From Swiss-Prot:
Exhibits a very high intrinsic GTPase hydrolysis rate. Involved in the addition of a carboxymethylaminomethyl (cmnm) group at the wobble position (U34) of certain tRNAs, forming tRNA-cmnm(5)s(2)U34. It comes from Burkholderia vietnamiensis (strain G4 / LMG 22486). GO terms for molecular function: GTP binding; GTPase activity; metal ion binding. It is an enzyme of class 3 (hydrolase). This is tRNA modification GTPase MnmE. InterPro entries: G_TrmE, GTP-bd, GTP-bd_TrmE_N, GTPase_MnmE, MnmE_dom2, MnmE_helical, P-loop_NTPase, Small_GTP-bd.
Length: 464
């Protein structure tokens, strides 16, 4: 839990380091108009007109100038936090920013001004109904976006695209709950509220809409989190060459000497806006070399955590007994793509195959050295991830959102079962609808615990 939500708070709102402009932001809590005017008098030597940019000197306690810049005063509720807010925009050097910050703290000591906690400005925006919880999370996601697609999707979430979908679902669930409750409250009435309003049809439509939202949310989560891809196999099958080919840069040392890579080498690349976290690992084999053994142990740890494993083979030898032993140790539930590398030495054309004997496993024949088949491998990784090329209107989502959507989906499925039994299960029908609504409301922040809010906002940067 953050300190006190009514305290005046201050922080540097721009990134650390040097820049053309730096911003110090102050939010004054409840009823902070007098404090805002007092601080602007102390720092700027004048009271500021609301929502007007004033070019003023920023002065210390003795009236000596610290900097000159733009001061902006936003009276409540028309500000980012919904409180009275003062922003000082000066030159973006770290020393001058620290001087302005300390000057604010000294001048505001009398009314309890303190340093803001991470995410506290956005937390107040949420508490003052300027943003819902999904939008607040989108602020952090927009700042942290690692690809253009992720940034655009976070922008759509911030613009309420995700929240509007959730609110529409909640309204439909509430409407259906009203029909069920009316039937429960007036059992003696001759009117069958559920039949008259086609309750089953309404429920089916809600479930269909929820499935669509969940599909979009999965795409958004993929944009945010990306895919962890581990390159595994015996030494000298071309794992480092494949990493370099996927990344388009010489990141790993490539030699004909087996065991060159002794620890993991990681690189994040973008494919259609999806971050792929590619991890090159030590070759898997029996060895007496202690350093190499440590690297191999780390390889298996990475494989356990992977979203996808690329099992590299030498296309000249195919699947050897040693490769069979390695494949047998791959964890259940982690997709494996068998990559037969070095087709430049065999003359086999690059291709993707689905051998009948391999079940669901896919084989990609390629040459990391020449680049043949690399695009096929990228496409296969996107297919495994479930990415739909050209998907429009995707909004960024988090694992928390997916969990809530899946839980709501399960409650609605249970509600559908109870709807079929009618009289015997009407109470349970109503309860499952209530639980589904509760899960959906948790996404936008209605009925959300303080503990969860504390975790979410603590992950923001200070000053946001």
């Amino acid at each position: 839990m953050l300190a006190t939500d009514s305290d005046p708070i201050v922080a540097i709102a721009t990134a650390a380091g040097r820049g053309g402009i730096g911003v110090v932001r102050v939010s004054f809590g409840r009823g902070g108009e007098a404090a805002a005017q007092a601080l602007s008098d102390a720092l700027c030597g004048q009271r500021l007109a609301p929502r007007h940019a004033s070019y003023v000197p920023f002065v210390d306690a003795h009236g000596a100038p610290l900097d000159r810049g733009i001061a902006l005063y936003f009276p409540a509720p028309h500000s980012y936090t919904g409180e009275h807010v003062l922003e000082l925009q000066g030159h973006g050097g770290p020393i001058v920013m620290q001087l302005l910050l300390q000057r604010c703290l000294d001048a505001g000591r009398g009314f309890g001004l303190r340093l803001a906690e991470p995410g506290e400005f956005t937390r107040r925006a949420f508490l003052n109904d300027k943003l819902d919880l999904a939008q607040a999370e989108a602020v952090a996601d927009l700042i942290e976006a690692s690809t253009e697609a992720a940034a655009r999707s976070a922008g759509r979430s911030l613009d309420s695209a995700f929240s509007r979908q959730i609110h529409a679902l909640v309204e439909d669930v509430i409407t259906l709950r009203m029909l069920v409750e009316a039937t429960l409250d007036f059992p003696e009435e001759e009117i069958d509220f559920l039949e008259a309003a086609d309750a089953r049809g309404k429920l089916a439509k809600i479930r269909e809409q929820l499935a669509h939202v969940l599909g979009d949310a999965r795409q958004g989560a993929l944009l945010r989190e990306g895919l962890s891809v581990v390159l595994a196999g015996q030494p000298n099958v071309g794992k480092s060459s494949l990493l370099n080919a996927l990344a388009g840069a010489e990141l790993a040392i490539v030699t004909p000497i087996a065991g060159t890579t002794r620890d993991k080498v990681a690189q994040t690349i973008q494919v259609e806006g999806i971050p792929l976290h590619i991890i090159d690992t030590a070759g898997l084999r029996e060895t007496e070399d202690e350093v190499e053994r440590i690297g191999i142990a780390r390889t298996w740890s990475e494989i356990e955590r992977a979203d996808v494993v690329l099992h590299l083979l030498d296309s000249r030898t195919g699947m050897t007994p040693e490769d069979e032993t390695i494949a047998a140790r791959f964890p259940d539930g982690v997709p494996v793509v068998r990559v037969l590398n070095k087709t430049d030495l065999t003359g086999v054309p690059a291709c993707v195959e689905h051998p009948a004997a391999a079940g669901d496993l896919t084989e990609v024949h390629l040459s990391a050295k020449r680049g043949d088949g690399i695009d096929m491998l990228r496409a296969e990784l996107l297919r495994i991830a479930g990415w739909q090329a050209g998907a429009e209107g995707v909004y960024l989502a988090r694992e928390r959102h997916l969990i809530a959507l899946r839980a709501a989906q399960e409650h609605l499925a249970q509600a559908a079962d109870h709807a079929e039994q009618r009289a015997q299960s009407l109470d349970l029908f109503a309860e499952e609808l209530r639980l589904a609504q509760e899960q959906l409301n948790a996404i936008t922040g209605e009925f959300t615990s303080d503990d969860l809010l504390g975790v979410i906002f603590s992950r923001f940067c200070i000053g946001k």
